[in-house]
């Protein structure tokens, strides 16, 4: 028994560290030593400054101090509005997910937000934030990632996340890799718990902590009918008494395959259905409704059916959310009982 346990533990470590190394190296393989940057911003600033100076000088010569003041106020207001609009246009994506399972539970509903921190033609550095409450556990997610576009018609990226179950005091880190092209997304994620065994809020006389694991995902769309999409995912977690499906059905080293279909009539709304099948004939079905708002796009474009095809392109999915499991999967262990010694 001990030999089998050691073999499983060794295999688990090999798989997890192989995933981490691949995910760290993935975007670096296509990342050049230096990113090119143009002088466009400097030239624009100089042009704006010249326009402002010329307008003020003209007003001062023709109408005096009051007119110059009004002109300066108008130009400053216009410039401020332009700056705010440009700043907002570089914000990425906000998504509200309404998720109901086959038991009528809405616990997996969530809010996620991605914002670029640095953005140019060939790369984007971004942060992603999220909040959700699966099984009544308020969980926050914060991540940092990079996406590169140096290979024609492909995006290669990597990310790191910190997940925190504020209610149950469980924490973990995650590493991810992405490879996207037009109408196709591939990704892989590794999850590693950082908190140790502690009192469980789900069971009396039990301890709990995050289970280590990984998943591999693929999502694709039909070029001839981009509103329809399909996805496939394989996931594996390690440990005894792991709640991959829920806390009432615990399994040892569980794995599962998920298949799903989704329909996007307009870029703003996506409806989906997922079916997950695991060991011991465990399965579940989930229905989801996502409201996906791109802050860099107009309202008209987000309710236009013609814009769905653009969303499926590599350029249109530049600020899409990272595809990962933001819910912390837990494992449980019964507390050791101490026997009283009679003298």
Please tell me what each predicted stretch does.
Residues 118-126, 151-158, 183-188, 225-232, ...:
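Repeated loop/turn-to-beta-strand initiation elements of outer-membrane beta-barrel proteins
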Residues 24-32:
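C-terminal segment of classical bacterial N-terminal signal peptides
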Residues 111-115, 142-146, 160, 175-181, ...:
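Residues on the lipid-exposed face of transmembrane beta-strands in outer-membrane beta-barrel proteins
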Residues 60-165:
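Outer membrane beta-barrel translocator domains of Type V secretion systems
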Residues 90-92, 105-111, 135-142, 154, ...:
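Residues that define the transmembrane beta-barrel architecture of outer-membrane proteins
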Residues 98-104, 131-137, 146-148, 162-166, ...:
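Transmembrane beta-strands of outer-membrane beta-barrel pores
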Residues 1-11:
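N-terminal secretory signal peptides that target proteins for export/translocation
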Residues 39-88, 194-231, 237-249, 264-270, ...:
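Flexible, glycine-rich linker and terminal segments associated
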């Amino acid at each position: 028994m001990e030999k089998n346990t050691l073999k499983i533990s060794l295999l688990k470590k090999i798989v997890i560290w192989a995933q981490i190394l691949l995910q760290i190296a993935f975007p670096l393989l296509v990342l050049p030593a230096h990113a090119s940057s143009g002088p466009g911003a400097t030239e624009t600033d100089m042009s704006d400054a010249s326009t402002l100076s010329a307008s003020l000088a003209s007003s001062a010569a023709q109408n005096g101090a009051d007119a110059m003041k009004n002109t300066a106020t108008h130009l400053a207001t216009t410039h401020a509005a332009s700056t705010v609009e440009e700043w907002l246009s570089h914000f990425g994506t906000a998504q509200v997910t309404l998720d109901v399972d086959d038991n009528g539970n809405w616990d997996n509903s969530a809010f996620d937000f991605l914002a670029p921190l640095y953005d140019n033609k060939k790369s984007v550095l971004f942060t992603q934030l999220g909040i959700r409450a699966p099984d009544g556990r308020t969980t926050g997610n914060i991540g940092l990632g990079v996406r590169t576009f140096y290979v024609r018609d492909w995006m290669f990226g990597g990310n790191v996340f910190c997940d925190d179950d504020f209610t149950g005091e469980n924490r973990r880190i995650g590493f991810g890799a992405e490879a996207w092209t037009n109408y196709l997304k591939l990704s892989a994620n590794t999850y590693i718990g950082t908190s140790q065994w502690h009192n469980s809020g789900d069971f009396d006389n039990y301890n709990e902590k995050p289970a280590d694991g990984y998943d591999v995902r693929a999502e694709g769309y039909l070029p001839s009918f981009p509103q329809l999409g399909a996805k496939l995912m394989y996931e594996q977690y390690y440990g005894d008494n792991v709640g991959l499906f829920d806390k009432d059905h615990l399994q040892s080293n569980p794995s599962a395959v998920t298949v799903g279909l989704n329909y996007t009539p307009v870029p703003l709304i996506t409806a989906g259905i997922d079916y997950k099948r695991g060991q011991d004939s465990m399965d579940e079905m989930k229905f989801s409704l996502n409201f996906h708002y791109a802050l860099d796009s107009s309202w008209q474009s987000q309710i236009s059916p013609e814009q769905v095809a653009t969303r499926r392109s590599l350029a249109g999915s530049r600020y899409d959310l990272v595809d990962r499991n933001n819910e912390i999967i837990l494992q449980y262990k019964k507390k050791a009982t101490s026997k009283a010694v009679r003298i």
